[in-house]
Amino acid sequence: MNRNVRKLTKLAAAYRAAEEAIVHAFFAKPRGKQDHLRWLRAQAFKEYSAIKPIFTALAKLYPEIDRGIDRHDYEELTEKLADETKHARLVMDLLEEISGKKITFKDLLWLPQDRKLAKIRARYSPSYATLLHGSGTISAKEIRRQDESIERAAITLTEGGGGALYRVCSELKTSGVEGRIAKVFYDILLDEVGHKDSGGRALAPLVKTQADFDRAAKIICEVSGQRLRMRNEQFGFPLSKNQLAELDRRAQGAVKGRR
């Protein structure tokens, strides 16, 4: 891994720490069952909404295996489908357990800042934005594109905020509602650990020039900065606008001048 890619992974790690700070701020105060329903409904949406577009992509790409689509990439997409399905099931089961009510997709929340995150990702890779959010229409032609490799790798490096939410929730106390939350998100975290270096590995052969580095850093900052606003909204704004801006500024400072 070259020096510039190490700097990009450092940048993504700084944003992961910033995202963790938001989640920590929420859990710093005592919370009742009702306090958890909104953020869990939003998280369940994020997991569930990826299932259909990945399934559709797999069906469309199947005839292209070893022709236009590498079999290893196809396998990776099948693993992602399995993970997202499992994670959606875990979070929705948790919602039912806490609320005492049957939960279906119509009960989940797609919040405004998450919608904005989808739009920002779509500026750089419409196909990846669709796979991650379930928004838009996916096509085999879009997935086969070879002219947005850096963009896709940079987005991958930011995906899930580096597991920030899962990490914080997995470390909650072991009893009561928080104990149930901790168990579910620890299970999800274990799945995410296997993918944690995929963005860096994808960027390694692509970032060859200063322009490549600047492009990737710009995408990481834009996507990750919006992730902070998304996460703060999801948890009911535990941090003020100024506090959020300071987290963003500090994270960007991880690679001063991006050079």
Spell out what each predicted region is.
Residues 1-259:
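Non-heme di-metal
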